[in-house]
Design a protein with these regions (language model features):
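Phosphate/dinucleotide-binding and metal-coordinating scaffold of catalytic cores
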Residues: 2-4, 14-564
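Short polybasic linear motifs
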Residues: 10-11
Length: 564
């Protein structure tokens, strides 16, 4: 008891001491010092900064998006590959990484099983992808073909690849935009993949070119053509000492004009007389276009092709349409014309910037064979006219807004799903709006022609006119005040920005009594013109003097006169 009394008395004294003003002050000072020292230590160790970062808006957004993504239920594919076959694939991968190019053959295909929706489906499987970005990390790219009569997600053949290899959600947006315009588009989804018990997360699933693709796009079955790339990649694969993207054609055997034209499912089309006829007709059309024997309209559905090119410009998506190895064309047996199929839209190594395929066609810095391939289309005035008309339509105010609203039900669930692994992803519609603005400016720059007077005579003005930019123009007349003086339309070709202007002499009929120029060099006369295919008429001022000034001969005479 005494001991307890003594302990109680000690406790009461301690409490009394703490209650004193002086003691409270010292306790506060001591506490502050402890907190300060702890704070310094935490700062040095990065603990405090980590805590602050953990509560930052960016971190909260990331966590929220990941959690939202976890509420999604992507289709799940469980792939079982025998150990021996998997090691064979791993060896192929190592060889490809050394070459920095993947070369595959029928001997590289292995058997596997895919478990999906409660069923086990036998498949054939191989690695896929040309460059080795398809083989980096754990998410290797695969081509899968369901055996016998089986299908997976309604497809007989498809590819599985890291979503990044096709620029995540942007590839799906491109296909859905094409589908909305009535063009042939692949099915493109995101699925959860497990291989031999290892959960690899989300893959992009891309439909492969075969009958079901055509039927899913509500077309009658017909061959899908391509330019065979085997020689191209074989030539590039041998250049092992050169970085992949710096490799080129040594002798040209892997180029556009040398590539064999082939079809997917060739054996199927050659199996029957009717199929063989379609196959040969389709190849003849594409071959004749390549050699310049037929026009664009004679080989292709020219309206669909123009829309395809214009939409690719709107989405800055040229990797497929602008490079001949990626070109895919469906032969429509009803119209006997080729139609483009959207595929492999984005070059994920180079950020997309606004531009036009028409400009790429004359850009001398571009790969020569791909430029020649594209320029064949734009050499056809009828196609160029439709292309520009489609550019005006898809770049008009409101088109992108309507597209965004229409595609939201398709894209938003996929984006939410992707954010399970890639929470920073957005659907960037502002870049599409910037591309639309670029198109409008390219079609209607502040001034597209320069015009100078050569001679003036009763009833006629002779003018030198030059196109200042890349798109071809139609010169359609003169205007002064409210008076319009039409002339026979004359076409002026475009030019690359590295080339000088080329002046063309054009005669403009004018009414009798029309006087120009007057005593002053200022003139109200304007040249009226249109970009080929555009509905808009633009004007530019005409100069009342020669673009050559005094002329070279007169300059030489003056130089002699002024010589000492």
């Amino acid at each position: 008891m005494k001991i307890k009394s003594r302990e109680g008395e000690t406790r009461r004294k301690a409490i009394g001491t703490l209650r004193s003003t002086a003691s409270r002050r010292w306790v506060a000072i001591g506490y502050t010092l402890v907190v300060f020292v702890a704070g310094v230590a935490a700062h040095r160790l990065g603990v405090l900064r980590g805590a602050i970062d953990l509560l930052s808006p960016r971190t909260i957004t990331t966590v929220t998006r990941r959690l939202q993504g976890l509420t999604t239920t992507p289709e799940r594919l469980i792939i079982d590959i025998k150990h021996k076959d998997f090691m064979n694939l791993a060896h192929q991968r190592e060889v490809a990484l050394k070459r920095q190019v993947l070369i595959v053959s029928d001997a590289d295909v292995v058997n596997a099983n895919v478990r999906y929706a409660g069923k086990t489906i036998p498949v054939k499987l191989r690695l896929k992808g040309d460059l080795t970005d398809h083989l980096e990390g754990d998410k290797w790219s695969f081509r899968i073909i369901a055996r016998s009569d089986s299908t997976i997600l309604g497809m007989k053949q498809f590819s599985l690849q890291h979503p990044q290899t096709r620029d995540f959600i942007n590839e799906k947006r491109y296909h859905e935009a094409m589908r909305r315009e009535g063009l042939l588009a692949l099915r493109y989804e995101f699925v959860d993949v497990t291989i031999n018990g290892k959960d690899l997360g989300l893959y992009a699933l891309e439909e492969v070119f075969e009958t079901r693709l055509v039927e899913n796009n509500e077309r009658k079955d017909g061959p899908i053509l391509r330019f065979n790339e085997d020689v191209l990649w074989g030539e590039l694969a041998r250049q092992e000492s050169v970085a992949p993207r710096d490799r080129g054609f040594v002798a040209g055997s892997g180029g556009y004009f040398s590539a064999d034209i082939d079809a997917f499912q060739t054996s199927k089309w050659l199996a029957t007389p009717a199929g063989r006829d379609q196959f040969l007709t389709a190849i003849q059309l594409l071959s004749s276009f390549r050699t310049g024997k037929v026009t664009v309209a004679e080989a292709f559905d020219i309206k669909k092709l123009a829309t395809f090119f214009a939409l690719s410009d709107l989405f800055s998506a040229w990797h497929g349409v602008g490079n001949w190895p990626n070109a895919r064309f469906y032969y429509n047996p009803i119209t006997s014309r080729l139609e483009p199929v959207s595929f492999d839209a984005y070059n994920r190594t180079t950020p997309a910037k606004p531009g036009l395929l028409a400009l790429q066609a004359i850009d001398e810095r571009r790969d020569r064979t791909s430029r020649r391939y594209i320029s064949q289309f734009f050499a056809d005035t009828a196609f160029y006219r439709l292309y520009v008309s489609e550019l005006e339509r898809v770049s008009a105010a409101g088109y992108v807004d309507e597209m965004q609203r229409a595609l939201a039900p398709k894209l938003d669930p996929s984006l939410k799903m992707l954010r399970r692994e890639f929470p920073e992803l957005e659907i960037d519609w502002q870049s599409v709006r910037r591309a639309a603005e670029f198109i409008r400016i390219a079609l209607h720059p502040p001034q597209a022609v320069q015009t100078y007077l050569r001679t003036a005579a009763p009833g006629e003005l002779v003018m030198d006119v030059a196109n200042m930019q890349a798109l071809p123009l139609r010169i359609i007349g003169l205007a002064r005040d409210t008076t319009v003086l039409p002339s026979t339309p004359q076409l002026l070709g475009g030019k690359d920005d590295s080339q000088p202007m080329q002046f063309t002499t054009i005669r403009f009929p004018v009414p009798r009594g029309f006087t120009w120029p007057n005593d002053t060099l200022e003139t109200p006369l304007r040249v009226r013109y249109q970009v080929v295919g555009s509905q808009q008429i633009d004007e530019a001022p005409a100069m009342a003097w020669s673009h050559e000034g005094l002329g070279v001969a007169q300059l030489r005479v003056n130089a002699i006169r002024l010589a000492p």
